[in-house]
Amino acid sequence: MSKNELLNVRIKNGTFYVSSKEDKGDGWVKQEFPNPQKKEETLVRYHKNVSIEGTVNHLAMNDDKYQGKVLNLIVGGEYQSYALSVPIMDTGGSVLTTNQYFNSLVGALENIKKGDKITMFVNSKNYDKKDRLYRNVVTLNSDGKLIKSNFSFSEVPKWKSSNTDNDFGETITKWDASPTNKFYIDKFKEVLASFKSENHKEESQDPEIKVKETPSIKSSSLQNSEPDLPF
């Protein structure tokens, strides 16, 4: 990989990875997916697992063609930078919820500032009672210590429920995660506002920062963010 290359990073079960339409050699593993737009067609991608370590450069909420609203975080490493996109909403289940990886990032981001050095990895060891990996991102500071949220799980609003009887006299419970969703989305908005405030302070203190940093991030993102299915 070339120096200062921007890697578009995604998350799958237990790891960060980058995706390519071409086999780039050592470490790249072939993956096959059904094309959601043409179900009779099989798409081929090559994945390579990566770790994220570097300096926090950029945080935003963006729109993705396939995933809707996403959290976008850019971390600058020594030889390459990492653009991590995480969908805010998880539409795969019967109840509309915020994405669990997103939730874990929001908690850590409360205590991360632009310029902080961090290390990030995806949980690959801890399982729930149903033997499923917990879907969370672990973030460490420059001293290797866990960056925790400012809130406890007991402070997160619970899902709402309502019961109705169907025509057979059976009681059906309908779940609504909107209180929980709003909590995490509001927290993310607060974090974004804090990052924007830091940017304004830097630019007012040193006008050169706007010229040196912002265009390089944006141009790199545009050059390396070819629209593709989220595989």
Which residues are covered by each model-predicted region?
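Low-complexity, intrinsically disordered short peptide segments enriched in small/polar/basic residues
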Residues: 6, 206-208, 214
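Short acidic, low-complexity intrinsically disordered linear motifs used
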Residues: 212-231
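OB-fold ssDNA-binding interfaces and closely related basic DNA-contact patches used
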Residues: 1-85, 93, 97-110, 125-166, ...
